[in-house]
Amino acid sequence: MSLVYMNIMTAFAVSLTGLLMYRSHLMSSLLCLEGMMLSLFIMATLMILNSHFTLASMMPIILLVFAACEAALGLSLLVMVSNTYGTDYVQNLNLLQC
């Protein structure tokens, strides 16, 4: 396994660890999710380029589209929670349930 793949997997693991450890603020959770999506995008792109599997070349683009939608929804939720409660604590999201 090359050093590039090891670095990308390490970046994914660090982002996942950050998501599991720093769950108190919504902004830090969103940043960790974006790090995970970026490392998945780079890993998928490199695997498709190295395997010369051109039929799956749209898969990283679709992953990037879903990452952009996730970021937009996350930021809108962050703005709504911070305007309503004044903080971006994840514990405030339990108050949004009906």
Swiss-Prot record:
Its main location: mitochondrion. Its EC number is 7.1.1.2. It is found in: Mitochondrion inner membrane. Keywords: Electron transport, Membrane, Mitochondrion, Mitochondrion inner membrane, NAD, Respiratory chain, Translocase, Transmembrane, Transmembrane helix, Transport, Ubiquinone. Pfam families: Oxidored_q2. It catalyses: a ubiquinone + NADH + 5 H(+)(in) = a ubiquinol + NAD(+) + 4 H(+)(out). This is NADH-ubiquinone oxidoreductase chain 4L. The gene is MT-ND4L.
